[in-house]
Regions:
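Positively charged N-terminal leader segments that act as targeting/secretion signals
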Residues: 1-15
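Short acidic-hydrophobic surface loop/beta-edge motif
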Residues: 16, 26, 38, 137-142
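Conserved beta-strand hairpin/beta-sheet module of binuclear metal-dependent hydrolase folds
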Residues: 21-68, 161-168, 172-174, 178-181
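Hydrophobic/aromatic beta-strand patches that form the interior of the parallel beta-sheet core
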Residues: 24, 76, 100, 132-134, ...
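Metallo-beta-lactamase
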Residues: 45, 52-53, 115-117, 139, ...
Length: 238
């Protein structure tokens, strides 16, 4: 959870292209969640935290998927705080996919109404339950894209990061940096809050130091809120 800029925030749409992988970023809902659409050249797509919260955001996401002839294969959540799950029901119903997240965050799905009242964040439709649980060492794959699951508790008990160790070539160059999608575990110059529903700052800092900071310095980090950063840049804060 991270402070947003209000309900009139525009749906932005940054696009990155790395060999066989397209990365489309939308900023959605009043809390400014970064939603990512990863796809290969064959049109297989992975959605990370697609927390669209109104018709305008749903239409922007749908339009991108349809215009690029994508087939959604996976619906992933880095964690299950309300601001990251607002679009789960829409995506699951429209594209026929199941929610995939860590089982230690499953209890948060029973607290959606409580979270909605706490943060004043309207919930159009509750998220469905977990369809597939992800744990440390698992991998989520479509041809040409492999995301390794890294479990880092502390922001939430079941917080996970998705690590792409080998994104492939760019313009024939093989030295392409790894990619990390840590949700609210790690931000540019900061980390996630730990005062919500089972949070633990000691566990969060420990997990970041043990599991994320040892990654290559040039790893590009796409956080759950805010701008991109690198692991090398974040090491100075720890």
């Amino acid at each position: 959870m991270f402070k947003g800029e209000g309900p009139e925030r525009k749906v932005s749409g940054l696009l990155f292209y790395i060999n066989n992988m397209n990365i489309k970023q939308f900023v959605v809902n009043p809390f400014g969640v970064n939603c990512f659409v990863l796809s290969n050249d064959a049109g297989d797509a992975i959605l990370i935290d697609p927390s669209v919260s109104n018709e305008r955001e749903e239409e922007a996401l749908t339009r991108y998927i349809e215009q690029n002839h994508l087939t959604v294969r996976h619906l992933l959540n880095t964690h299950l705080h309300l601001d990251h799950v607002l679009g789960n029901a829409f995506v699951a119903r429209k594209y026929g996919v199941q929610l995939e997240a860590h089982e230690e965050d499953a209890f948060l799905l029973d607290l959606q109404e409580e979270q909605s009242q706490m943060f004043g964040l309207p919930m159009r439709e509750p998220s469905p339950g977990l369809g597939n649980t992800l744990a440390e060492g698992d991998a989520v794959e479509v041809p040409g894209i492999r995301l390794q699951v890294i479990h880092v508790a502390g922001h939430s008990p079941g917080g996970i990061a998705f690590y792409c160790e080998n994104p492939g070539e760019v313009n024939g160059q093989k030295n392409v940096p790894p990619l990390l999608f840590p949700g609210d575990i790690l931000f540019a110059g900061s980390r996630g809050r730990s005062d919500l529903f089972g949070g633990d700052d000691h566990a969060l800092v420990s997990g970041i130091k043990r599991k994320l900071l040892p990654l290559p310095d040039d790893t590009v980090v796409f956080p759950g809120h805010g701008p991109t950063t690198t692991i090398g840049d974040e090491k100075r804060w720890y």
